């Protein structure tokens, strides 16, 4: 990191020739040094440019102001990185940094030349960029003209001139392209350059098609991006995500190609089948030759009315049949102008792309099924599930991750900045002394006027009696400072910093029952937050957390005076007082983005805050965590420590990184140097700098003030009304009234009523009703106006307008009043829609709504930029479309429209072009593209549409979604569920409840006194009732209110099982889901016996909010046998009972609940003797039967059979008499069996257990239905209406299967958990939509009626019929005229919602939009595009109602599953235990043991073949052949010549021969081992089938199936390409994600099938006979079970549900005929029932399309992120696989050991990252590998040591080690037991020692031999003597180091002997690990 020079006056130095010379000198010096430095390792990166001083950024404010005369002047570069580079900077007035190259521009202009200086001045001036911006915008407006006038030519020249001028200025200022920071070095300038070049080219050179070149001008719109800074980053993110998409795109293209090939083989030519009229004496050929044009088609082929294409038909039995008098032929062109077909590979590919993006795919689906047969539905199921759901969501996942990474990078950068500033400030501290004088003066200045307020602050601190002394003193000091600010009204400045209406501001402002003075004091208290308690870690004043949770709940109840809340309560339940008032200080420091960490409730941990009276309280901290805080007696351990807490994870909100920087910057002291004080100019700058960085908050406020000080004086005088004492009293009185919770409740009720009144508007309304609505509106307006006025009086305007909600209220009231006065003005009725905004006032008291609005608010920031980018893209494409295709639409319109008028969707003018582009963004591109291709040629249209589709829809819209999902940080929704702060509404409701209960109780007591004869029982009952009433009060809204503690309670005998007695009184029963037991997000402090807590000795402050500690807490939760140890995390709805005494599993439980037994003692039966004993034995027998596995299996079989029986009851049942009779008897049998099962279970389990299980209730209800219908049938009432409708409820029978199949139950439990949030979102959607719905009434009610000709449903033109009366006149004259309404319209609130749902799902929205656009007025005949701009209403609705709200579903569901995952300890919630095993196996692919390689055959011939086959080149050749084969299959097309068919046939034969050859070769060389490899078996099967298909094609075709199936099987070979994927890491990750998602997706699919099954049965019984029109016809209907399933599968993606609903909305003639007779059936009429139909379809769409399919998305996103994480790890599974592959060669017998001598070769044979290249002996020795006898080393030890080398030493290594051992043990149960006897290091040491000893001995012998030779030799011998000694020393060293070395490494390196890894070791290891982790955490904490 480059250290920045201390910013001071000397930082700004003019750039002169000397500066340039200095730089050149530095460069020269650098060059001379370079040669030496070259040797340095490349890894040491040089200094980097400072991120704060990058070009384009603002000058950091630490530099103070720019001295006069230095603005827009060349200055020396501030960034040290550029010290030796030729650059200089220029700063403009806005302090933006511009960096320039100091070399001469264009080799002419030096930095000092006047021309360049002037250019630079122009370039950096803010007006220059403004001018360019305005030019671009004006230019864009001109571009939208479709046929511009002559004079616009000159305007064009002007634009070109301005752009040229801009470029010249840039080139003069920067230089052209040589060197850094020149013109062409910035890619954005390339754009300018191209635009200008083209402008001149088109002018001077005649290039033919000008309009195409003119489209290049559109690129100018992109320049806006380069001018607006925020956009560049978004575009950066977009480009990043497109790069990341490459893998997905490859995978998508591959999958689509495969599917397209299958489609090509299956459906080639099928879509040309048409119904031809039978004509006497004419053959098909003669007819075809006589047909010339389209027109003739109509004569011969069968057309359905209103359709452009002839009716399709097929030759198979289950395909579409032709009507009477027609027969099926293959003739003519394909449907949709011939563009929909599978005839060639390219059209098939387009069709599959369309399927994948799900655009109008129901049409393709219906056409294909009609032509080919219903069995092919399977093809579509596979494509939709794999292609559409999987691939499209992968794109979403990738884009979301790219966004997330971008986010992460920004946060990193922020941290980096913080570091830089810290370093800077450290430097500045050196100058401290000089600055002290100034600081002192400032302090004097601020202290004036403090003392005045002494008394006041004194009293205010009295209010917090519980606080510790020191905190109180500190608070007083702060208060004195702050009071001064209050009086001068300056807190406004402070609020600017707290992100508005977020953090604590919204808390403090909403206190109730404080006088106005008290109210103000409370704000004081808030200002004083930072220093007031020891807990406040960083000043919460600056903690403007981005999505701070506080604002969601903490609206009310901050004051001390809370008498009102406790009016009915005795003192035992009073609220934990000071905790309320000090809420502000309880911020927990958070690290950016650590969203999922659990938050410890600090409130419960701070001793000074406890009341000392031994009562239990609940503290609620600022994050909404409730903690039960007991008096000291219970809360302290004997040694005075606080207890650890049981925390059940609670997510926290994001902290934005930037706020922390700001805090750092502000809080540090700032210093000035002496000499500044002399120079007045500098002194002034010094002052400005001091004001920025002093740590006195006041000055900070002043420097931050948004408004001039006179404004504050004015506000103080006029906006705070404290005139006379009487007025103040009056004000206080009003305040008490207005702020009372009951008033709030009343206002909320008014809002709800007002909303209802607005929703009740409908189309024909009576006068009375109209008047009621008008009067109602006046009344409500009055009420809201009064509320506003009273609040203004009570709070003073100054306070009133500080609260966001009040500003909102006042706006709405003002608008309502304005609207009242302007009510009669025509055209202003839209103002009425502003009243709707009142609905949003509900958010005040409805947390979910508030939160969702907040989420939308949060994402609007980044979305603002994204929306701009989207707008620019839409604009560009709209203009491009208009320029390229506009003319063609005009000229060739007759091709697409019979009457030669422009269709509704065209590109002839900008607005329509924009609509088409917008429609493509909505995902509907194919229909407009057909039109385009028909008029303007295929190529251009395809290119433009695909670009819009991919860029706009797939990338930008997914980025939209990603942003939305990221603003759903994981705390949001769950937080609401446990909204722990009662807001005013809840307080009011609680009060009402208390009142009612009080009345009930007194009444009951009176009655009991009068009648009671058994006082004992009555007392018990009363106790129970008390318990209930208290439960209701204190634990309302999932809040654990105060739990009082009563010491005498210990003496009571009956205790609730499993729970300690001290809470008996106030705890709910375990089965109650409201309790904290089922609400794991509450923090509960629990006493634990000292011996049981493994966290006991940790200091409580260390329970950090790090997520690692979740595990230890969970363990604590399980191990401590404390009061809460039976906490059961079961999902609500399973109703499991927590029993204390271990129940013997084969004994039934009690029959009745304790309550029953208490009231009716007769229920208690003694089981010791007599009848009781017999009864007990019977129960035991039943219990054994019911618990037997066979019984369960039998019942499952019965359920399946009875469900299956329902599928037979279709419209043909009347004709099949035998089946009908069988079904009737079967039905009775099933009913009896189920009744028997129920009775058995009653006897076995007892009523208590049976009726507390939700699944049993389900069984019970379904059995009841069967029973009722059975009884009715026997009594002969089976034809009664109600009985018939009950029969349809039998469709619910399959639901019983849910509880029996674990896979589905898992998913359903997850769903049930998500239901509350889904409901919340649904409600919010409804509220959101309500606004559009009410606007819709104002705009369209009653305007959708039209006069039509019933023969062909065409509308009369307005010239003939202009209004209703004229239409009725016509009707009298003719039968065929009708004044009819659109079925789906805006006439009443239900239909409005239905219309909006159709628009939001983009199904059926066209008709609604056309009707809206054509509408004229009530009772007027519509006219074509009369109201064109109504499209905008729909565009806005789609953006807010569809993009936002429907995507909130995805957000909520994903969010919820993350929540549930946490509750279940991070396991995937969609999988059963079995599937989890599969999943984990998938994850541990690396747990392979070394395999024996296939031995090379001994036979020489076989050996050669073996070498060939196992060679990699062979594999690659085969892959190439497969690819070629695929290409030849792609070449096939419909209607190819015979020659081509022959060629392809022979090519295919060649391929079959080649693949057979491969097969044979492998069989010869691999022998029986061939079949041990999965791929080989696959190949073998494919080859055999290919041969069979080739030789027996004719035979099979005549007798069995069509040979196309064999052609499809050949495609299976393509699957082998997947083997190549080993190489492509990215794609493998994606496939791995798919493999991991499979089990969960299978379960979700099962659930979806179940839902479809039930709905299909239901549909059959209700809609089998509806009229066939719109989407219902002879193939797609509800007549049989199969047809129903086909229809429902189509609606699962919401496709075409409008068409199926339309016929069901026919309720009376003339739409349908209620008397129509259906032959063979007793039913008559073909009318639907609209209410049932709407409920049926809407519920199905919500369940399948919005919930289940989104679960699918959630799973994919989840697994994708897991797979990506795994693939980014330094060592992946592949590396381990590679290790074992190499191992096989060195250990052919798979002994798992290799000899030490081979180790060096082995290490060198590996691939990176495990590779250790030779020479590697030393490294290997240093690894200290354990060896066994025979000098062998075990593979795991080697693998582990190598891994360690890659990953480095760390704590994680230990966990990895244990994982590997565990893996290995699981993979090799037959593990060779071995004891390591030595290690490589020891072996080396032994070698050395042996050598030394040998040497010494040799020398000794030598010495003996030469003893008696001359004295010289003796001297030599002495020298020799030394050598051994040296050796000895070495030896000693080695020896002494050896034990230590082995000791030191023993713990981490030498593995425990594998066969002795027993449980105790493991546990000890675990313990060590946790201790290490804890230590690590302590370290982290201290660092903080």
From Swiss-Prot:
Catalyzed reactions: Na(+)(in) = Na(+)(out)
Tissue distribution of the protein: Expressed in the sciatic nerve, spinal cord, brainstem, cerebellum and cortex, but not expressed in the lung, skeletal and cardiac muscles, kidney and liver.
Sequence ranges of Basic residues compositional bias: 472-484
Composition skew (Acidic residues), residue ranges: 1134-1146
Name of the gene: SCN9A
Membrane protein topology class: Multi-pass membrane protein
Protein name as catalogued: Sodium channel protein type 9 subunit alpha
The family this protein is said to belong to: Belongs to the sodium channel (TC 1.A.1.10) family. Nav1.7/SCN9A subfamily.
Protein species of origin: Oryctolagus cuniculus
Positions on the Extracellular side per record topology: 146-150, 205-210, 268-344, 362-374, 760-768, 820-828, 886-912, 926-937, 1210-1221, 1276-1284, 1340-1391, 1403-1428, 1532-1542, 1596-1604, 1661-1683, 1697-1730
Parts of the chain on the Cytoplasmic side: 1-125, 173-185, 228-241, 401-742, 794-802, 846-862, 965-1184, 1248-1249, 1302-1314, 1455-1511, 1565-1573, 1625-1637, 1757-1984
Stored SMART domains: IQ
Biased composition (Low complexity): 459-469
Annotated GO CC locations: axon terminus; plasma membrane; voltage-gated sodium channel complex
Record lineage: Eukaryota, Metazoa, Chordata, Craniata, Vertebrata
Domain statement: The sequence contains 4 internal repeats, each with 5 hydrophobic segments (S1, S2, S3, S5, S6) and one positively charged segment (S4). Segments S4 are probably the voltage-sensors and are characterized by a series of positively charged amino acids at every third position.
CDD domains with a match to the protein in the record: Na_channel_gate
Keyword vocabulary terms for this entry: Cell membrane, Cell projection, Disulfide bond, Glycoprotein, Ion channel, Ion transport, Membrane, Phosphoprotein, Repeat, Sodium, Sodium channel, Sodium transport, Transmembrane, Transmembrane helix, Transport, Ubl conjugation, Voltage-gated channel
Superkingdom to which the source organism belongs: Eukaryota
Function according to Swiss-Prot or TrEMBL: Pore-forming subunit of Nav1.7, a voltage-gated sodium (Nav) channel that directly mediates the depolarizing phase of action potentials in excitable membranes. Navs, also called VGSCs (voltage-gated sodium channels) or VDSCs (voltage-dependent sodium channels), operate by switching between closed and open conformations depending on the voltage difference across the membrane. In the open conformation they allow Na(+) ions to selectively pass through the pore, along their electrochemical gradient.
Subunit field text: The Nav1.7 voltage-gated sodium channel consists of an ion-conducting alpha subunit SCN9A which is functional on its own regulated by one or more beta-1 (SCN1B), beta-2 (SCN2B), beta-3 (SCN3B) and beta-4 (SCN4B) subunits. SCN1B and SCN3B are non-covalently associated with SCN9A. SCN2B and SCN4B are disulfide-linked to SCN9A. SCN1B regulates channel inactivation. Interacts with NEDD4 and NEDD4L; regulates Nav1.7 activity most probably through ubiquitination and subsequent endocytosis. Interacts with TMEM233; modulates the gating properties of NaV1.7.
Residues spanning the membrane: 126-145, 151-172, 186-204, 211-227, 242-267, 375-400, 743-759, 769-793, 803-819, 829-845, 863-885, 938-964, 1185-1209, 1222-1247, 1250-1275, 1285-1301, 1315-1339, 1429-1454, 1512-1531, 1543-1564, 1574-1595, 1605-1624, 1638-1660, 1731-1756
PTM notes: Phosphorylation at Ser-1487 by PKC in a highly conserved cytoplasmic loop increases peak sodium currents.
Modified residues (Phosphoserine): 1487
């Amino acid at each position: 990191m480059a250290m920045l020079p201390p910013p001071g006056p000397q930082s700004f130095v003019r750039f002169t020739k000397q500066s340039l010379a200095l730089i050149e000198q530095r460069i020269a010096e650098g060059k001379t040094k370079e040669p030496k430095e070259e040797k340095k390792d490349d890894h040491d990166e040089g200094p980097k440019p400072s991120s704060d001083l990058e070009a384009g950024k603002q000058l950091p404010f630490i530099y103070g102001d720019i001295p006069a005369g230095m603005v827009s002047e060349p200055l020396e570069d501030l960034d040290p990185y550029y010290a030796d580079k030729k650059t200089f900077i220029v700063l403009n007035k806005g302090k933006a940094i511009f960096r320039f190259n100091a070399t001469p521009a264009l080799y002419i202009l030096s930095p000092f030349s006047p021309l360049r200086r002037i250019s630079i001045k122009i370039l950096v001036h803010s007006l220059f960029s403004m001018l360019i911006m305005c030019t671009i915008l004006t230019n864009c407006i001109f571009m939208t003209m479709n046929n511009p006038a002559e004079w616009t030519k000159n305007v064009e020249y002007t634009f070109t001139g301005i752009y040229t001028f801009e470029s010249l200025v840039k080139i003069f200022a920067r230089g052209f392209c040589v060197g850094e920071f020149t013109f062409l070095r910035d890619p954005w300038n390339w754009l300018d350059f191209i635009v200008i070049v083209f402008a001149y080219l088109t002018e001077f050179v005649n290039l033919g098609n000008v309009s195409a070149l003119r489209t290049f001008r559109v690129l100018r719109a992109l320049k806006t991006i380069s001018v607006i800074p925020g956009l560049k980053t978004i575009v950066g993110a977009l480009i990043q995500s497109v790069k990341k998409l490459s893998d997905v795109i490859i995978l998508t293209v591959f999958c689509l190609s495969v599917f397209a090939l299958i489609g090509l083989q299956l459906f080639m030519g099928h879509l040309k089948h048409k119904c031809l009229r039978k004509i006497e004496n004419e053959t098909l050929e003669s007819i075809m030759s006589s047909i010339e044009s389209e027109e003739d088609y109509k004569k011969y082929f069968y057309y359905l009315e209103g359709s452009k294409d002839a009716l399709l038909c097929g030759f198979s039995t289950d395909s579409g049949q032709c009507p009477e008098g027609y027969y099926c032929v293959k003739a003519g062109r394909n449907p949709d102008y011939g563009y929909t077909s599978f005839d060639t590979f390219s059209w098939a590919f387009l069709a599959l792309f369309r399927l994948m993006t799900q655009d109008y795919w129901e049409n393709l689906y219906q056409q294909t099924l009609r032509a080919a047969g219903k069995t092919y539905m399977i093809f579509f199921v596979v494509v939709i599930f794999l292609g559409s759901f999987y691939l499209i969501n992968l794109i979403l996942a990738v884009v979301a991750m790219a966004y997330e990474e971008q986010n992460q990078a920004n946060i990193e950068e922020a941290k980096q900045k913080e570091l830089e500033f810290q370093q800077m400030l450290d430097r500045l501290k050196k100058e401290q002394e000089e600055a002290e004088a100034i600081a002192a003066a400032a302090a004097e200045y601020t202290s004036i006027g403090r003392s005045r307020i002494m008394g006041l602050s004194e009293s205010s601190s009295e209010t917090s009696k519980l606080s510790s002394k020191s905190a109180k003193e500190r608070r007083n000091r702060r208060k004195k400072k702050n009071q001064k600010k209050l009086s001068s009204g300056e807190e406004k400045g402070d609020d600017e910093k707290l992100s508005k209406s977020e953090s604590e501001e919204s808390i403090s402002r909403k206190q109730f029952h404080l006088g106005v003075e008290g109210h103000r004091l409370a704000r004081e208290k808030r200002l004083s937050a930072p220093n007031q308690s020891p807990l406040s870690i960083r000043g919460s004043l600056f903690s403007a957390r981005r999505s701070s949770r506080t604002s969601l709940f903490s609206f009310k109840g901050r004051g001390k005076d809370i008498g009102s809340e406790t009016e009915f309560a005795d003192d035992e339940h009073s609220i934990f007082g000071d905790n309320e008032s000090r809420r502000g200080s309880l911020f927990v420091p958070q690290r950016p983005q650590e969203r999922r960490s659990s938050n410890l409730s600090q409130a419960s941990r701070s001793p000074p805050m406890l009341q000392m009276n031994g009562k239990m309280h609940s503290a609620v901290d600022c994050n909404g965590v409730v903690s039960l805080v007991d008096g000291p007696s219970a809360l302290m351990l004997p040694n005075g420590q606080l207890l650890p807490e049981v925390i059940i994870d609670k997510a926290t909100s994001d902290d934005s990184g930037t706020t922390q920087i700001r805090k750092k910057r502000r809080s540090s002291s700032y210093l000035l140097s002496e000499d500044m004080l002399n120079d007045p100019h500098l002194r002034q700058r010094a002052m400005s700098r001091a004001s920025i960085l002093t740590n006195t908050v006041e000055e900070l406020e002043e420097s931050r003030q948004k408004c001039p000080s006179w404004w504050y004086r004015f506000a103080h005088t006029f906006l705070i009304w404290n005139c006379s004492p009487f007025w103040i009293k009056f004000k206080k009185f009003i305040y008490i009234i207005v702020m009372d919770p009951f008033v709030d409740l009343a206002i909320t009720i008014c809002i709800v009523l007002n909303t209802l009144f607005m929703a009740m508007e409908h189309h024909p309304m009576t006068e009375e009703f109209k008047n009621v609505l008008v009067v109602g509106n006046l009344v409500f307006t009055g009420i809201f106006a009064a509320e506003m006025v009273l609040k203004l009086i009570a709070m003073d305007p100054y306070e009133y307008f500080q609260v966001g909600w009040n500003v909102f209220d006042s706006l709405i009231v003002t608008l309502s009043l304005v609207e009242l006065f302007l009510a009669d003005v025509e055209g202003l009725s839209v103002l009425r829609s502003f009243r709707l905004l009142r609905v949003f006032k509900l958010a005040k008291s409805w947390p979910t709504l508030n939160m969702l609005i907040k989420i939308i608010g949060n994402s609007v920031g980044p979305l603002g930029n994204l929306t701009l980018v989207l707008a620019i893209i839409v604009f560009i494409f709209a203009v491009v479309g208009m320029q390229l295709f506009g003319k063609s639409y005009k000229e060739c319109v007759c091709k697409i429209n019979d009457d030669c008028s422009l269709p509704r969707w065209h590109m002839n003018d900008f607005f329509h072009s924009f609509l088409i582009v917008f429609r493509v963004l909505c995902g509907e591109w194919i229909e407009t593209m057909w039109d385009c291709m028909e008029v303007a040629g295929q190529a251009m249209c395809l290119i433009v549409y695909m670009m819009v589709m991919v860029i706009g829809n797939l990338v930008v819209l997914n980025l939209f979604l990603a942003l939305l999902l990221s603003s759903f940080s994981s705390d949001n929704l769950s937080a609401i569920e446990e909204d722990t702060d009662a807001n005013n509404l809840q307080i009011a409701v609680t009060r009402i409840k208390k009142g009612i209960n009080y009345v009930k109780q007194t009444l009951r007591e009176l009655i009991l006194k009068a009648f009671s004869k058994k006082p004992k029982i009555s007392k018990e009952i009363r106790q129970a009732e008390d318990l209930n009433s208290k439960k209701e009060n204190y634990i309302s809204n999932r809040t654990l209110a105060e739990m009082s503690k009563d010491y005498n309670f210990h003496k009571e005998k009956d205790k609730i099982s499993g729970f300690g007695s001290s809470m008996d009184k106030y705890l709910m029963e375990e089965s109650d889901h409201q309790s904290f037991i089922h609400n794991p997000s509450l923090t509960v402090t629990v006493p634990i016996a000292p011996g049981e807590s493994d966290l006991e000795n940790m200091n409580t402050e260390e329970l950090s909010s790090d997520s690692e500690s979740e595990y230890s807490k969970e363990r604590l939760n399980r191990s401590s046998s404390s009061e809460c140890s039976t906490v059961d995390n079961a999902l609500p709805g399973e109703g499991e009972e927590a029993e204390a005494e271990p129940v013997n599993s084969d004994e039934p439980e009690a029959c009745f609940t304790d309550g029953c037994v208490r009231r009716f003692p007769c229920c208690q039966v003694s089981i010791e003797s007599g009848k009781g004993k017999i009864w007990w034995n019977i129960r035991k027998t039943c219990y054994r039967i019911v618990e037997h596995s066979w019984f369960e299996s039998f019942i499952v079989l019965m359920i399946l059979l009875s469900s299956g029986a329902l599928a037979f009851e279709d419209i043909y049942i009347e004709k099949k008499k035998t089946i009908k009779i069988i079904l009737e008897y079967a039905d009775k049998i099933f009913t009896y069996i189920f009744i028997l099962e129920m009775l058995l279970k009653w006897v076995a389990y007892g009523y208590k257990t049976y009726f507390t299980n939700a699944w049993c209730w389900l069984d019970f209800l379904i059995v009841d239905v069967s029973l009722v219908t059975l009884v009715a049938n026997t009594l002969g009432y089976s034809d009664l209406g109600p009985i018939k409708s009950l029969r349809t409820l039998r469709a619910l029978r399959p639901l019983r299967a849910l509880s029996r199949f674990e896979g589905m139950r898992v998913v359903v439990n997850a769903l049930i958990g998500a239901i509350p949030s889904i409901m919340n979102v649904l409600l919010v959607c409804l509220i959101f939509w309500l606004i559009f719905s009410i606007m819709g009434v104002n705009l369209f009610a009653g305007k959708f009626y039209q006069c039509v000709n019933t023969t062909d449903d065409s509308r009369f033109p307005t010239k003939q019929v202009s209004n209703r009366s004229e239409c009725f006149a016509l009707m009298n004259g003719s039968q065929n005229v009708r004044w009819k309404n659109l079925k789906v319209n805006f006439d009443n609130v239900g239909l409005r919602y239905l219309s909006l749902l159709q628009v939001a799902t983009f199904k059926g929205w066209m008709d609604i939009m056309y009707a809206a656009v054509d509408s004229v007025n009530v009772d007027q005949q519509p006219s074509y595009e009369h109201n064109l701009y109504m499209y905008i209403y729909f565009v806005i609705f789609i953006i807010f109602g569809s993009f936002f709200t429907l995507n909130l579903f995805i957000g909520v569901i994903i969010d919820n599953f993350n929540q549930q995952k946490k509750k279940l300890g991070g396991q995937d919630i969609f999988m059963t235990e079995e599937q989890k095993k599969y999943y984990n196996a998938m994850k541990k692919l690396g747990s392979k043991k070394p395999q024996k390689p296939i031995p090379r055959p001994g036979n020489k011939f076989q050996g050669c073949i073996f070498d060939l086959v196992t060679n990699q080149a062979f594999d690659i050749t085969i892959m190439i052949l497969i690819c070629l084969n695929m290409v030849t299959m792609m070449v096939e097309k419909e209607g190819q010549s015979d020659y081509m068919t022959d060629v392809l046939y022979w090519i295919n034969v060649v391929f079959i021969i080649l693949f057979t050859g491969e097969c044979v070769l492998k069989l010869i060389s691999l022998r029986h081992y061939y079949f041990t490899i999965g791929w080989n078996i696959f190949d073998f099967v494919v080859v055999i089938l290919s041969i069979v298909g080739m030789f027996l094609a004719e035979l099979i075709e005549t007798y069995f199936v069509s040979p196309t199936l064999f052609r499809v099987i050949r495609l299976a070979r393509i699957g082998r390409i997947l083997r190549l994927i080993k190489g492509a890491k990215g794609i493998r990750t994606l496939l791995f994600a798919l493999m991991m998602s499979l089990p969960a997706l299978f379960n979700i699919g099962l659930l979806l099938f179940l839902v479809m099954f039930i709905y299909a049965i239901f549909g059959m019984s209700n809609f089998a006979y509806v009229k066939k029109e719109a989407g219902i016809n002879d193939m797609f209907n509800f007549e049989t079970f199969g047809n129903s399933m086909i229809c429902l599968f189509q609606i699962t993606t919401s496709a075409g549900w409008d068409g199926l609903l339309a016929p069901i909305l026919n309720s009376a003639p003339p739409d349908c005929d209620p008397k129509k007779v259906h032959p063979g059936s007793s039913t008559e009429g073909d009318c639907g029932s609209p209410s049932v139909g709407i409920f049926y379809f809407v519920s199905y769409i919500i369940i399948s399309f919005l919930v289940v399919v989104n679960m699918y998305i959630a799973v994919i996103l989840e697994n994708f992120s897991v797979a990506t994480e795994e693939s980014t790890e330094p060592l992946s599974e592949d590396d381990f696989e590679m290790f074992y592959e190499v191992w096989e060669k060195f250990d052919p017998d798979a002994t798992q050991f290799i000899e030490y001598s081979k180790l060096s070769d082995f290490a060198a044979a590996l691939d990176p990252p495990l590779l250790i290249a030779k020479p590697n002996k030393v490294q290997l020795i240093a690894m200290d590998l354990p060896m066994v006898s025979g000098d062998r080393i075990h593979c795991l030890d080697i693998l582990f040591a190598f891994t360690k080398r890659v990953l480095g030493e760390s704590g994680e290594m230990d966990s990895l080690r244990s994982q590997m051992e565990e893996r290995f043990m699981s993979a090799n149960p037959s593990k060779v037991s071995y004891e390591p006897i030595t290690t490589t290091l020891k072996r080396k040491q032994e070698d050395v020692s042996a050598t030394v000893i040998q040497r010494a001995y040799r020398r000794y012998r030598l010495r003996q031999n030469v003893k008696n030779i001359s004295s010289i030799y003796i001297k030599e011998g002495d020298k020799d003597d030394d050598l051994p000694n040296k050796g000895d020393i070495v030896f000693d060293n080695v020896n002494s180091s050896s034990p230590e070395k082995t000791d030191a490494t023993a713990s981490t390196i030498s593995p425990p002997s594998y066969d002795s890894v027993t449980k105790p070791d493991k546990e000890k290891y675990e313990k060590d690990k946790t201790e290490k982790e804890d230590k690590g955490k302590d370290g982290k904490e201290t660092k903080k």
